[in-house]
Amino acid sequence: MFYHIKELQYQAKPAHPDPVYAKKLQEVLGGQFGEISVMMQYLFQGFNCRADAKYKDLLYDVGTEEIGHVEMLATMISRLLDNAPADVQEDAYKSNPAIAAVMSGMNPQHAIVSGLGAMASDSEGYPWNAKYIISSGNLLADFRANLNAEAQGRLQVTRLYAMTDDPGVRDMLSFLIARDTYHQNMWYAAIKELEERERDIVVPTTFPRELEKQEVSYDLFNFSRGDESSQGRWAHGEAFDGRGEFRYIPAPIAFASAPHLKPAPMWLHNTVPPMSKC
């Protein structure tokens, strides 16, 4: 179960209202790599975890912290919308707040739909989507997805930090940036621990290697003009799983012939291929 404490994990007080920035901040709340996404991703990985108790507990720890980050951002967005839209529009638009909201760059749904509150959507008003989250049951795969989510999230928050000079907003964002720093390090540590325990880096580690076409397991195919990619570490030397040698293939060949499909049944009304001449 969850137990709510009314105090925020960290303060979320802007120095002044800014409905346009509130729209931008929606991205790290309800966007693909926003706090709702990582909250749901970690919690569902925790709900579904069948591995060690320490990993399940870690997922619950971080997932529950992310609930607090959702709360902080929702609070900040609501406060940025205080006195909006009328008090922040030019005199020419004050007689029509809806028009003023659109003309100023504010998200009109913040006034019409949520009543000056945050929404579970991104900066363009697109609703949060459960397809954003990954919970596969394979912790090595999932933790790598978590590391990417934290990296993308931190990147977006740092960009938002540069888009405002409000000291209160920057203060809260600096806290979130710091937490993302820890979370990236944390997931990296968990990934390395699992790699060492499973003695492999290729997911899934439990699939028998003899069942894959090992002749191409470590080949880089040059499928674009130029050969600059041959200069990378991924093109030569021992592979990082320790089970093969990287090879650069400058002129890849086809391993199969051109495919020819049978005509579809007539009742599907597909285009019929031309009849061959006798």
From Swiss-Prot:
N-terminal signal peptide: none
Alphabetized InterPro entries for the sequence: Ferritin-like, Ferritin-like_SF, Mn_catalase, Mn_catalase_C, Mn_catalase_dom
Domain of life: Bacteria
SUPFAM superfamilies from the UniProt entry: Ferritin-like
Protein family according to the UniProt entry: Belongs to the manganese catalase family.
Name used for this protein in its record: Uncharacterized protein YjqC
